[in-house]
Amino acid sequence: MSIEKEKFWASHKQVVKEIGGTNLINGKHDLFKAVAYTSDDIEAVESQFGVPIMGLQFHPEMSMYSNAFTCSEKGRDKKIYLSFQQSVWSFHNKQVLLAEFKNSKHYSKTQHPTEDITEKLINYENNKYNNNIIDIFNETSVEIIGYSNVEILN
């Protein structure tokens, strides 16, 4: 989510001075990125990978000015909360789907789901394309997002 540079009301002094202990196992990237600062503190962080995580240490719903509830500020505030709501629903749906998968008869902790599937060759008119997906695609009239006769260039 992108919010233009703006002044927010931050009335608390319990703030993060630095981000630490968030490296991924491979040590190449930090999980969190600081996205809002004051002159001496980090005020907000966002996760860069995996589940969306946002940490706010200010009041995004309140401006530091008396005209805190202008239309543009209300729109900005709504975007923040809608983004949060969308993240909550996405995480919930992922958990439901994962539970359904784990409880299905096709899931096995000891066997990969595709181990018992044998590979089958594609037969198109006596296999004139030699199972080459690029040849099959180029010889077939297709429609992708409103474009017809799309070609893959080698």
Curated annotation (Swiss-Prot):
> What Gene3D superfamilies does the annotation carry?
3.40.50.880
Membrane-spanning segments? none
Transferase listed as a keyword: yes
Indicate yes or no for the key word Transferase. Answer: yes
Alphabetical UniProt keywords? Glutamine amidotransferase, Transferase
Q: Outline the extent of the Glutamine amidotransferase type-1 domain.
A: 1-94
Q: What InterPro entries does the entry give?
A: Class_I_gatase-like (IPR029062)
The record's GO molecular-function terms, alphabetically, read: transferase activity
Query: What protein is this chain from?
Result: Putative glutamine amidotransferase-like protein RP712
Higher taxonomy: Bacteria, Pseudomonadati, Pseudomonadota, Alphaproteobacteria, Rickettsiales
